[in-house]
Amino acid sequence: MKRLYPILFIFSFLSAEIYDVSIPENDTASYNYADFRMWVNDSTDTLRGIYWFMHPNNGDSRNIVTDSAYQALVSEQNFALMGAHIFNMHMNTGIGDAVIAAMDSFAVLFRHDELEFVPFFVNGYSWGGQFGYHFTKWIPERVVGFITQKGGYHDTTDAGDAIEVPGLMFVGENDLPYRIENLTGIFLEHRPLGAKWILAMEQGTGHTQVTDYSFLNSFFNTISNLRLPDSMDVFQPIQLNTLPDTLGWFGDQNSWIIGSFDCYDGLIDSSSWFPSKNVGEQWQYFVSEGE
């Protein structure tokens, strides 16, 4: 791993602390800048993961850490909450190494050594979703699950082991065709390989952020509960649970009919894969506009 040196900033908020870490480029990196902010609930003894919201192009998601709804969500799972200000989404620039270096610094600042090893859940909108998908492909063993919302430039090459990382992929019915085609194509290319992914088209919308938090949060909670081992040593690399195909439910992209592994009679290779019946029902309601 490339040697990177952090720049640190400290904030204090009542029952929690917030820290900023920036990782400047070294002479082998070309990602421009990488700035991170993290919140940890003081009542959390041992962290189990990091919920990371990623911004759209030229954005900055660091202020997400002061959002009380997200704080409550992640605290229930004993996760940290993180936002970032990042320029480059391509892992060959060294940006992935910068993320890992930032976690090492946060581990020291928060006095939570487990931050060196716990997995990420990445939820990204537009460019941020593309980043999250690329990060998942780069280091799938450190990602418990991901959400990508309506990006149009996801890497279309083989996803490798990332097919075992549960993903929720959103497209907008009225978005630009290239965005719909990019993510739909990746989904259809990898579902026959067993990718544990969901494709959800939001009807009547364009390039807007998804606000169905019941669906988003249900996916996060379900995946976290299933993928994180009941007993785990968070002070060394964590072996995340691989979810068997038989656990899943499936959903037809056209009829919106869902069914369990044993009962579903649709075309598996082009159907969404859900980690639970509840997530499948949330998808069904979302894509059908509640019909």
Task: For the regions a language model picked out, list residue spans one by one.
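Alpha/beta-hydrolase active-site loop
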Residues: 90-115, 134
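Cell-envelope and extracellular/periplasmic
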Residues: 52-58, 125, 132, 136, ...
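Loop/turn elements at helix/coil->beta-strand transitions in domains of secreted/extracellular proteins
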Residues: 45-51, 76-82, 116-119, 139-145, ...
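The feature captures the conserved acid-bearing segment of alpha/beta-hydrolase catalytic domains
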Residues: 144-221
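A domain-start/cap signature at the N-terminus of enzymes
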Residues: 16-50, 120-138, 153, 289-291
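Alpha/beta-hydrolase-fold serine-hydrolase catalytic core, especially in secreted/extracellular enzymes
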Residues: 193, 203-291
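Sec-dependent N-terminal signal peptides
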Residues: 3-14
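Short substrate-entry loop that stabilizes the transition state in hydrolases
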Residues: 44-91, 176-180
